[in-house]
């Protein structure tokens, strides 16, 4: 199946989009996220949300129903200018189509969006609850957010000293690799942390994820429709790979930690076709 026809053959499922922009906070990430979510509406959804990261921390805004409901929530409580963001449109699987169950899910410094189904989430949820965490949703994704936050916190404690944002982002890569090695099922996961707001860490297994390569900004999406309005340069993410996205760099590793160079291509259709 070619990359150009794959978009039209996907069955309804969650849509995800990510953006990392220049270090000066702005509305750019929110603009990219909302445009991308609009172009992913063809996948079907029953709720939507965004998480935006900047020097002031994380803002998470979400709503049940259509994107207009999310736009209304954003107008009622505008998020601070950001340097990075992740967005999601959800088809309910674990947990009903409510605002609480909508993505992104937050745990401590972490916010996560997810496309897929974590088959062993009940056992992992019990583990998270025994660690003293209170979960507010019925979703498998919130469990992953807590696992990432717990793992990252342990790595930060083990470091024994204050780390800069770049070092924290690398630790989040290690946390993502450790957590996803324990997950059973299919997933495309995007995570941001208020401790390193200029980065997205992501991973995939049996669920679509594509990189968009920009100039001074980079993108992620369930498919190229999520970012084709901003760049036509795309790169593949293979199964069980983990990646770190900043405004100027994209790093991809296999599950054993070996750095890889992703295959790239030019998208042949323009944004007018992705509506």
Question: What residue ranges belong to the model's regions?
Answer:
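Conserved short alpha-helical segments that host acidic/polar catalytic motifs at enzyme active sites
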Residues: 2-275
């Amino acid at each position: 199946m070619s990359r150009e026809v794959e978009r039209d053959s996907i069955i309804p499922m969650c849509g995800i989009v990510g953006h990392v922009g220049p270090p000066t906070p702005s509305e750019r990430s929110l603009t990219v996220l909302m445009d991308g979510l609009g172009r992913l509406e063809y996948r079907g959804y029953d709720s939507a949300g965004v998480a935006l990261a900047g020097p002031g921390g994380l803002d998470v805004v979400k709503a049940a129903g259509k994107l207009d409901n999310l736009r209304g929530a954003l107008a009622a409580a505008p998020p601070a200018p950001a340097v990075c963001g992740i967005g999601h449109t959800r088809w309910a699987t674990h947990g009903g189509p409510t605002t609480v169950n909508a993505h992104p899910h937050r745990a401590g410094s972490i916010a996560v969006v997810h496309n897929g189904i974590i088959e062993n989430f009940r056992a992992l949820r019990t583990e998270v609850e025994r660690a003293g965490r209170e979960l507010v949703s019925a979703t498998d994704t919130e469990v992953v957010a807590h696992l990432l936050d717990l793992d990252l916190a342990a790595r930060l404690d083990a470091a024994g000293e204050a780390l800069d944002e770049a070092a924290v982002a690398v630790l989040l890569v290690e946390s993502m690799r450790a957590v996803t090695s324990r997950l059973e099922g299919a997933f495309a996961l995007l995570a941001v942390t208020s401790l390193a707001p200029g980065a997205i860490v992501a991973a995939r297994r049996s669920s679509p994820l594509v990189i968009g390569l920009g100039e001074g900004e980079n993108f992620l999406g369930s498919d190229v429709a999520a970012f084709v309005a901003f760049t036509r340069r795309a790169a593949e993410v293979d199964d069980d790979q983990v990646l770190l996205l900043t405004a100027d760099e994209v790093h991809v590793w296999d599950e054993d930690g070996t750095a890889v160079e992703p295959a790239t291509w030019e998208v042949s259709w323009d944004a007018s076709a992705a509506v």
